[in-house]
Design a protein with these regions (language model features):
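Predominantly a Rossmann-like dinucleotide-binding segment in NAD(P)-dependent oxidoreductases
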Residues: 12-13, 129-209
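Contiguous beta-strand/loop segments that form the cofactor/metal-binding neighborhood of enzyme cores
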Residues: 179, 186-262, 302-312
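Active-site loop of classical SDR/Rossmann-like NAD(P)-dependent oxidoreductases
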Residues: 41, 237, 289-303
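Rossmann-fold dehydrogenase core element
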Residues: 111-129, 149-153
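C-terminal helix-rich "cap/oligomerization" subdomain common to oxidoreductases
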Residues: 1-3, 9, 37, 72-74, ...
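N-terminal Rossmann-like dinucleotide-binding module
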Residues: 1-52, 306
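Beta-loop-alpha module in the N-terminal Rossmann-like domain of NAD(P)-dependent dehydrogenases
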Residues: 53-115
């Protein structure tokens, strides 16, 4: 199988650049890593990553974009710079993987999608739950009609982060709704489709004197129900309470926790647990549960990217990604 020659532009402290680079390097049967670039003074801002990248060729952005043998690029800069470099990659005619959801500028995102469409380039975004095996199972079962009419999706993705990371949320409209809530909006949109209205509800807790929107929330209205997402950056124990709950007329599915690391520190692979109930007759019906085999969220994501670069139909179209980005901004009050 032909390897895809790929480079990475950028990394960041609070997103997944180092994990994506590690996945590219480890999946040697899929990728040949040409090198990396650290724009925007990332050497000075993120010295903790130098050792990880040191064995690979340091390049400039211009060297990556002008190298005809490099056919794909992962853009993993800080969020505010994502669309700047993504557009450069697309204009250079290279396939693109980009950290989610992009910089908070709709015109720039529309321009990016237009370039990608015109050049027929692969486009992948870092929405990690798309490749969670239990999420994939849930989406398949919803699509099959097993739950009947769906009237509610609830999704939570919370954590307890440092004062410094909560201050960083000032970079975005809606704070946590933009930063992590976008993962959940992706799930709501896949299951429920186009909402009739979006109600942004993000707030600042003010804890530690930080006045960013560290409590993200949004409600999505539909003709036959309501769905909501919540992403708090101040929730003690929030990681294991991350969930996706889908309620239909015939039954309910709940993935909780959405991810769990059962073997830290020996292994950073995750598992996910599906809970389900289809007993409509018993008031206190018990839920059954099943936990997935261990998986790596980034390996599955980048394997999918390799497949669409090679010509597999992208399950997430350009138009889907654009409309999702618009919904994310609406949920953030923009």
């Amino acid at each position: 199988m032909r390897k895809i020659k790929i480079a990475q532009i950028g990394t960041s402290r609070y997103s997944h650049g180092s994990s994506i680079f590690a996945s590219l390097c480890e999946q040697k049967e899929l990728f040949e890593v040409a090198g990396y670039a650290f724009p925007e003074n990332e050497d000075e801002k993120f010295p903790e990553f130098k050792e990880q990248y040191a064995p690979y060729r340091r390049m400039t952005v211009e060297e990556i974009l002008s190298d005809p043998t490099i056919e794909a690029v992962a853009v993993e800069t800080e969020e505010v710079y994502l669309l700047k470099y993504a557009k450069m990659v697309a204009k250079a005619g290279k396939h693109l993987h980009m950290e989610k959801p992009g910089s908070p500028n709709l015109d720039d995102f529309r321009e990016l999608v237009s370039i990608l469409k015109e050049k027929n380039l692969a486009f992948s975004l870092g929405y990690m739950y798309r490749f969670n095996p239990k999420v994939k199972e849930l989406l398949s079962r919803v699509k099959s009609g097993e739950l009947g009419k769906i009237f509610s999706v609830e999704a939570q993705m919370s954590c307890k982060h440092s004062k410094e990371q909560r201050a960083f949320l000032s970079d975005f409209p809606g704070g946590m709704t933009f930063f992590l809530g976008c993962h959940l909006i992706d799930l709501v949109y896949q299951i429920m489709g186009e909402p009739t209205a979006v109600l942004p509800l993000s707030r600042s807790t003010g804890i530690d004197g930080v006045h960013t929107d560290d409590l993200g929330m949004a409600v999505f209205q539909y003709e036959n129900g309501i769905s909501f997402i919540k992403a708090s950056d101040n929730e003690v124990g929030g990681f294991l309470r991350r969930n996706l709950i889908v309620t239909g007329e015939r039954g309910s599915l709940a993935i909780q926790p959405l991810e769990y690391y059962p073997a830290l520190p020996e292994s950073d692979k995750q598992t996910a647990t599906m809970n389900e109930c289809f007993d409509t007759a018993v008031w206190q019906a018990e839920w059954t549960k099943e936990t997935s085999l261990p998986f790596d969220r980034y390996d599955s994501m980048m394997k999918n990217f390799a497949e669409i670069v090679r010509g597999k139909e992208n399950p997430y179209s350009y138009d889907y990604e654009l409309r999702l980005f618009e919904l994310v901004l609406q949920a953030c009050g923009k």
